[in-house]
Structure formats: C-alpha cells, structure tokens
Amino acid sequence: MSEAEARPTNFIRQIIDEDLASGKHTTVHTRFPPEPNGYLHIGHAKSICLNFGIAQDYKGQCNLRFDDTNPVKEDIEYVESIKNDVEWLGFHWSGNVRYSSDYFDQLHAYAIELINKGLAYVDELTPEQIREYRGTLTQPGKNSPYRDRSVEENLALFEKMRAGGFEEGKACLRAKIDMASPFIVMRDPVLYRIKFAEHHQTGNKWCIYPMYDFTHCISDALEGITHSLCTLEFQDNRRLYDWVLDNITIPVHPRQYEFSRLNLEYTVMSKRKLNLLVTDKHVEGWDDPRMPTISGLRRRGYTAASIREFCKRIGVTRQDNTIEMASLESCIREDLNENAPRAMAVIDPVKLVIENYQGEGEMVTMPNHPNKPEMGSRQVPFSSEIWIDRADFREEANKQYKRLVLGKEVRLRNAYVIKAERVEKDAEGNITTIFCTYDADTLSKDPADGRKVKGVIHWVSAAHALPVEIRLYDRLFSVPNPGAADDFLSVINPESLVIKQGFAEPSLKDAVAGKAFQFEREGYFCLDSRHSTAEKPVFNRTVGLRDTWAKVGE
C-alpha cells in the first residue's frame, strides 16, 4: 500500500488539501494544546493522533503547547505526564515545548489594545452577577453598569488589577461585544480574571491570568498555526476566536475547525468524574488499569500501536457518537495476537499427578508463536506433578466438553496424552488432586493406535512453577453509558478487578513491565509496573482472547 493510500480520509484532510492546492497555505502547522490539570485519556489520544498525524503526513509541524492559564488547577506533574504520553504514543513535537504562559506579556499588550479601541472594559460585578446579567438561551443579557467606562478609566483599573489592587472576584476584564447576541459566548466574555496563585512557569510575576478563549486564538496566531483543530463543544467559541483576532493587530489569522469528541462505552471521560473515582478510592490512581487514561491503558498492557490503530478506525467526523468498547479491545487483541509471545499460566490451579511417569522430569520444546517460527522456541520443564486449571476437569461431562473428564483422555499442550483415573477430595468435597496415567509415546504426536484425542489443555510443572498474582481486569462499569446514570458510582462493575493466585511457567520470571504475553487459552497479560516484585510477579489481564461481553449484550 502506498503512503497516499495508507492515509486516512476525512473532512479536515479535505480542507487541508484544498488549502494547499489553492495556495492559501504552503505548509501545514497544527498544535496539541492540553491544559496541565490532569492525566490524558483515550479521548485526548484521538486529538493527538489527529494533530500529530496530519503534521506527519503533510510533512508539516505540530506544536505541543500547554494551556497553562489557571495556576490553581495546574501542576508540573501533569506537564511531565502529558509529555511522556505523547512520546509513548509515537509522536514528537516541533521545536521546544511551548506554554501559553510564554505569551503572557503579549497577551497583556493585546488586552490593552482592545481597551484602547473601546472593545474591552473592567467590570466590578461579582461572578454571580455576571452570570445573572448574561441571560439565557431564550433571554438576552443586559449590560453591566460598568460597561461604558472611559478608555482612560479602564486602562487605570486594568493596571490596578495587574498590580494586585483588587481582591479575587472583585474585578475582571471583559470584551465589549453584544449582550443581546444569540450566542452566549459573545455576551461580553471575561478576558482576564484575578488569581493570587503561584504559577508553575512564571512564579508570582502575575496575579491576573487570561481566559482560555482569549489566550488560545492569540497563541495559535503567534505560533503560525494554519489549522486549529478542536472538539465540537468549542463550535460556538469559534465566533469569539475570530472576533479577538479580527480586532487586534496580528499578522496571522488561523482558522478553527471542529470535530466530534470520542465517547467510549463502559467508561467516563469527564475529568470531574475521573477525579472522583481516584479521590474516593474506587480505583487506586490515575494509572489504574481500569481507567481510560493513557497511563492506565499503558499499565494494563495496551500498546501505542493499538491505540493509534483505534483512532484511525473510528475516524474523524462532525457527528457525535459513542464507540463500542469492543472496538478498542479488538485493536489490542489483533496487535497482541500477532506480536505477543506465548506462555503458560494456570489461574485457578488444581494439582494433577501422573502416576506412571518415571524419572525426575524433562524439557519439552514449545514455539513462542504458533505462526511465527522466527520468534523462536523455548524449553519448558515437565514433571510427574503439574498444575492445571480447575475449569479444565470434570468428573462427568457431555460431549461438548473437550477437556479432561474422569476416565477419558486429553492432550497436555506440546506434551503427552493423559487419562484421568481418579480424584482425591477434601472434607468439603472439593477436588484437591487428580490422578492420571500418560501415554509415553505421545510426546507432541498422535497415539500410535490412531485413537483420536480432541481436547488440549495447558499446564505448569509443579516443581518448577513460578507463583504469580494474576489481576483479571474488566470493564469498570456494568452499563454502556455510566455517565447517564443518576449516580454513576452506583454502576461500577463489582467484577472489574478479580485477583487470583496462580502458577506460571518459569520463563516468566524474566518478564519486564509492559511486555505482553498471551497466556495460552486465557488471554493477553503483561507484568504490572507498580506491584510486581522479583519474589511475586503480578500480571495484569489486558484483554481476553475473545469478546465475552458480546454474549452479555445479546
């Protein structure tokens, strides 16, 4: 497939193609502008892939700019986390990391220009009064009594704000546009507010901070952004974006284009709700493998390639829709099926003893991937006592059950055919040991007499087993749209994390965090980066071998 054929097609790329063909632009310059007040989630991944992907495909540039205009909510911890997430996803920003705070001096000068043009004024209404005066979707707003102050008075008052002469909430700078506008965003929006808080980049230099809508468009223009891409909730804000740039002296006027945000089933994207999950300890942190954060997905075992593929598949449109969780899971399942080496682990172990097996044991050869001989093979120890999964044995079963049944045969993966002879139980009637015999002439081959053995189960040698903790992660919520519930916390899936103590083949003692494996017949797993120790590895289930939720929804 050629490079052109491999590129996704969407309405934004069509606009860019037209702009380049007409000569409106000779290059493409985009940006990704997160606020450093939290961790990025899968919705941000869509924006990252769009902005950086466009720059990559058109051989342009993409800036990473932190919209750091609210020092109360922001932290350098989030800055570093976001930079790490962007790089982990496989993208690199153009030049240095940028901050909106880099432009605070220019933004202040542009605010003064608007005051001098009679297009901005210092308002002393309280925040509550400003909301009241703004009106509603059906009722126009009304002018502030401070709206008609002179230019000189507004300049003096704005300087007083700058010098710390007002308390927080006692004054702000507003644009003078139209309080009767059908668009609430155009009803004299606030441009600057007072916050006595230390800023992670500028320290205590400023006590007035520009609002997002004032900062964003000017930052785009100062950086020479050609296509400013944002989600649909900012559609009305485009009017203010254009108004600001039309009324200041700036040589470049970027254009804003909106696309639909990513909504994903069985999770929430609201920063407030995600924060509540963390602070109320429903999850163990922002990187909990059940969270939709990029750090959570990474810890769970999602690869950057699978997330990029997911963003490519869902596409870019202007129509809001909700994506099935199965779509995301399908991307990682396909990736790991292709690339993850195989290993054996028993999640719910029961002891199996092969009574006629002689000797200390032996090594059996197993391929690391059944379809990729280039991935090599490994030696796995086999002995007379092994662990198998409790679900792989029944005393009685129908013909559909293809695993081990009392009096019948099954094959041990890449080893021998065995037959269950008897069981031993505890006082409560639970099976503690399964006693078997084996056919010594069936190591990785069919029985010589031609009898058919259909079932295959996995196993781990008891003498060589690595004790492991296995964390079976599942969807965090039990309903597709938890955000619609009166209390979204009430629909948390109680089975979203089930912890098991099992055994794994000894090769897994060399596993490293983030390295994925297919535990044969169980699913895809990776070593946990937070809880694993050399003595007790912890493996997280990334995704099952198939979509078990599909049956639930039928």
From Swiss-Prot:
Metal-binding recorded as keyword: no
Residues at which ATP binds: 35-37, 41-47, 231, 261-262, 269-271
Positions of short motif 'KMSKS' region: 268-272
EC number of the protein: 6.1.1.18
InterPro entries, sorted: aa-tRNA-synth_I_CS (IPR001412), Gln-tRNA-synth (IPR004514), Gln/Glu-tRNA_Ligase (IPR050132), Gln_tRNA_ligase_bac (IPR022861), Glu/Gln-tRNA-synth (IPR000924), Glu/Gln-tRNA-synth_Ib_cat-dom (IPR020058), Glu/Gln-tRNA-synth_Ib_codon-bd (IPR020059), Glu_tRNA_lig_a-bdl (IPR020061)
Keyword annotations of the record: Aminoacyl-tRNA synthetase, ATP-binding, Cytoplasm, Ligase, Nucleotide-binding, Protein biosynthesis
CDD domains: GlnRS_core
Swiss-Prot/TrEMBL GO biological process terms: glutaminyl-tRNA aminoacylation; glutamyl-tRNA aminoacylation
Recorded superkingdom: Bacteria
Cellular component GO terms held in the UniProt record: cytosol
Motif segment ('HIGH' region): 34-44
Alphabetical list of Pfam families matching this protein: tRNA-synt_1c, tRNA-synt_1c_C, tRNA-synt_1c_C2
Compartmental location: Cytoplasm
Protein name (Swiss-Prot/TrEMBL): Glutamine--tRNA ligase
Naturally occurring in which organism (per UniProt): Shigella boydii serotype 4 (strain Sb227)
